[in-house]
Curated annotation (Swiss-Prot):
Belongs to the prokaryotic/mitochondrial release factor family. Pfam families: PCRF, RF-1. One of its GO terms (molecular function) is translation release factor activity, codon specific. Keywords: Cytoplasm, Methylation, Protein biosynthesis. It is found in: Cytoplasm. InterPro entries: PCRF (IPR005139), Pep_chain_release_fac_I (IPR000352), Pep_chain_release_fac_I_sf (IPR045853), Prokaryotic/Mito_RF (IPR050057), RF-1 (IPR004373). Its main location: cytoplasm. This is Peptide chain release factor 1.
Length: 367
């Protein structure tokens, strides 16, 4: 059964929904386009909650009727049938109660944003760089399945096809809401191609996921920037440029340095570098502002040490384990090709469960 506090909030939302429905039929509202659109937007935000709450109340009534039937029905077969139905209703109620609580949680304002992902080789030398390349391909595969666009900002490739570092943008609806859980240290256990004795090695790569920020989200004073240009290779590191198209931007107050050289023109490189700088500055200011909160998302890059990990990719056993939710899949190849939803869906659920738990702990402490 939902707590009184939750029921009161749901009834308040339902009442507001009915008010909006009524207002939208009034001539003075219809003729005021700005007010009309504002009400439509407000209605859309709460519509799912109202529908779920209506379904919840319907299930409560069904449960009540079935409880009476299980107590008063004389026919044994009908009573058994009612008991079985009651069991199903209880399961549905449990699920819908969780959904309603989750819908009442505050939304992450960055969930619908595009993202900037940074992958860096950690412990393990060349093998770590190869693993960083595997992770990059995994995220490209996932983005393709979602119909999202991937654009490389900068990369530092190695001779064997790995990456010491690669930074890229993922553009698509809800990209941050799905991929923010990838932040942290990823660990691989396998026999490296450079290993002649066939011994299994452990290497790491770190992943950071930053929401892409608009200029209005992060204010940058041009006087705080030192912008340098340098000669660079062209796209993918080919063709030496005779012009200085590479761009390095230093944000002097924070010490953050961003550089981009993958595009042919200085203007394009500067534009991409500014995107990364805005995202890093947003994360920097957030961390400063909420320094006391040791949240996973704000400690993204990590040190790359073997002990600090969120997920392990074990090649000999074809197993991928996410240590935050203690979940393993034995579909290693599929995961590395971009089949990540089985992990992401569980991580979203775990996050909601944790948020609900904290919310009601706080409510209990103040009531």
């Amino acid at each position: 059964m939902l707590q009184k506090l939750v029921l009161d909030k749901l009834e308040e939302i339902e009442k507001r929904f009915k008010e909006i429905e009524n207002l939208l039929t009034k001539e003075e509202i219809i003729s005021d386009l700005s007010r009309y659109q504002s009400l439509l937007k407000e209605r859309a935000k709460i519509e799912e909650i109202v529908e779920k709450f209506s379904e919840y109340k319907k299930l409560l009534k069904e449960r009540e009727d079935l409880e009476v039937m299980t107590k008063e029905e004389q026919d044994e077969d009908l009573r058994s049938l009612a008991e079985a139905e009651l069991e199903e209703i209880e399961k549905k109620l449990e699920k819908i109660e969780f959904d309603l609580k989750a819908l009442l949680l505050p939304k992450d304002p960055n969930d619908e944003k595009n993202i900037i992902m940074e992958i860096r080789a950690g412990t393990g030398g060349e093998e770590a760089a190869l693993f960083a390349a595997d992770l990059f391909r995994m995220y490209v595969g996932y983005a393709q399945k979602k119909g999202w666009k991937v654009e490389i900002v900068s990369s530092n490739p190695t001779g064997l096809g790995g990456y010491k570092e690669i930074i890229f943008i993922v553009e698509g609806k809800g990209a941050y809401s799905r991929l923010k859980f990838e932040s942290g240290v990823h660990r691989v256990q396998r026999v490296p191609i450079t290993e002649s004795s066939g011994r299994i090695h452990t290497s790491t790569a770190t992943v950071a996921v930053l929401p892409e920020m608009e200029e209005v989200d992060v204010e940058i004073d041009p006087k705080d920037l030192r912008i340098e240009t340098f000669r660079s290779g062209g796209a993918g590191g080919q063709h030496v440029n005779k012009t200085e198209s590479g761009v390095r931007i230093t944000h002097i107050p924070s010490g953050i340095v961003v550089q981009c050289q993958d595009e042919r023109s200085q203007h394009q490189n500067r534009e991409k570098a500014m995107k990364v700088l805005r995202a890093r500055l947003y994360e920097y200011y957030q961390r400063e502002k909420e320094n006391e909160i040791a949240s996973q998302r704000r400690q993204q890059v990590g040190t790359g040490e073997r002990s600090e990990k969120i997920r392990t990719y074990n090649f000999p056993q074809r197993r991928v384990t996410d240590h935050r939710i203690n979940y393993s899949s034995f579909q290693l190849e599929e995961v590395l090709s971009g089949e990540l939803d089985e992990f992401i869906d569980r991580l979203i659920l775990a996050e909601k469960e944790e948020q609900i738990k904290k919310l009601f702990e706080e409510v209990g402490a103040t009531s």
